[in-house]
């Protein structure tokens, strides 16, 4: 599983930064959070693949977070995508996409399903779930939390051999949590598996001011990607525009007992993120500043 940053600039692109777009790739599936203008260019550079199982989660309907969906859909069609795609977002997301497809008069080579956020839990399958929390921004906006479900413990090869279990399909069944029968004896998964491994938690703030609700929402995340548009010197500007400073992001992470903080969404006024990193590290020990095409392996 890995995080891939496709765009890390706020409001407008720079020579080195595209607009907001973050991907979480796991087991051949891509979960994309926001898609600012030209997201398809960074996506192409990432090598993530055009026909993978995919879901797009939009935090809010400001152009630097959603306009890139249109180009992404068109490019995927030109690449002959056939896999269906789901899109989740705030009220208005369906009208936004449908109107643009109609006006631009382009067809898609694959089906899309658009979901308007109405509940806290918006997606769940046997391996993970996605929850939302209202962010504090200038328009309706949501933060997202990816929660991986606990995984089976590590498979003990030596124990399996001692029990006379032939390698292959029966090993796979045990690893998937199923009982098997060997020589008329029932063997339970716990006989060959270690303790269950806790799943990972990854938070994506989108554009927001810091709030106590978000601190609770992101509690004990393994990684938290948080709005860091400004430095402390522009704290008033952050408040006026409903964004956060790097130091405020670090404070949220510290209070939420987050293991690793990733700063992103930097204002184009800054040439680099040296000061963002310095200010955040005054509060939290483990801080990364995101760059376009940065990949973070999550183990």
From Swiss-Prot:
The question of whether Cytoplasm is a record keyword is answered with: no
Q: GO molecular function terms here?
A: 3'-tRNA processing endoribonuclease activity; zinc ion binding
Q: Which UniProt keywords apply?
A: Endonuclease, Hydrolase, Metal-binding, Nuclease, tRNA processing, Zinc
**Broadest EC class?**
hydrolase
Give me the residues that bind Zn(2+) 2, please.
Answer: 64-65, 207, 265
Q: Report the coiled-coil segments.
A: none
Among Pfam families, the record links this protein to: Lactamase_B, Lactamase_B_2
Q: Which cofactor does it need?
A: Zn(2+)
Q: Where does Zn(2+) 1 bind?
A: 60, 62, 137, 207
Q: Which domain of life is it from?
A: Archaea
Its EC number is: 3.1.26.11
Q: Which reaction does it catalyse?
A: Endonucleolytic cleavage of RNA, removing extra 3' nucleotides from tRNA precursor, generating 3' termini of tRNAs. A 3'-hydroxy group is left at the tRNA terminus and a 5'-phosphoryl group is left at the trailer molecule
**Catalytic residues (UniProt):** 64
Cofactor stoichiometry and binding?
Answer: Binds 2 Zn(2+) ions.
Q: How does it assemble?
A: Homodimer.
Q: Its family?
A: Belongs to the RNase Z family.
* This protein's name: Ribonuclease Z
Ranked from the top, the taxonomy reads: Archaea, Nitrososphaerota, Nitrososphaeria, Nitrosopumilales, Nitrosopumilaceae
């Amino acid at each position: 599983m890995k995080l891939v940053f496709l765009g890390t600039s706020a409001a407008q692109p720079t020579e080195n930064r595209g607009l907001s777009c973050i991907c979480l790739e796991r087991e051949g599936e891509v979960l994309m959070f926001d898609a600012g203008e030209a997201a398809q260019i960074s996506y192409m550079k990432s090598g993530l693949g055009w026909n993978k199982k995919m879901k797009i989660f939009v935090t809010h309907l400001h152009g630097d977070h959603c306009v890139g969906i249109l180009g992404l859909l068109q490019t995927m069609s030109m690449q002959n995508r056939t896999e269906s795609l789901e899109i989740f977002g705030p009220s208005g997301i369906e009208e936004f996409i449908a109107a643009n497809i109609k006006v631009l008069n382009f067809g898609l080579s694959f089906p899309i399903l658009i979901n308007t956020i109405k509940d806290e839990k918006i997606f769940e399958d046997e391996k993970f779930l996605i929850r939302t929390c209202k962010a504090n921004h200038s328009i309706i906006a949501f933060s997202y939390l990816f929660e991986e479900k606990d995984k089976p413990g590590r498979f003990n090869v030596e124990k399996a051999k001692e029990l006379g279990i032939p390698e292959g399909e029966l090993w796979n069944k045990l690893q998937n949590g199923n009982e098997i029968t060997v020589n008329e004896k029932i063997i339970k998964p716990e006989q060959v598996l270690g303790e269950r491994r806790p799943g990972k938690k990854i938070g994506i703030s989108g554009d927001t001011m810091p709030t106590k609700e978000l601190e609770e929402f992101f509690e004990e995340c393994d990684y938290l990607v948080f709005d860091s548009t400004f430095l402390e010197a522009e704290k008033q500007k952050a408040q006026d525009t409903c964004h956060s400073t790097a130091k405020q992001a670090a404070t949220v992470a510290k209070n939420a007992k987050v293991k690793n903080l990733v700063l992103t969404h930097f204002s184009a006024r800054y040439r680099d993120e040296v000061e963002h990193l310095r200010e955040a590290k005054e509060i939290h020990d483990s801080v990364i500043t995101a760059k376009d095409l940065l990949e973070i392996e999550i183990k």
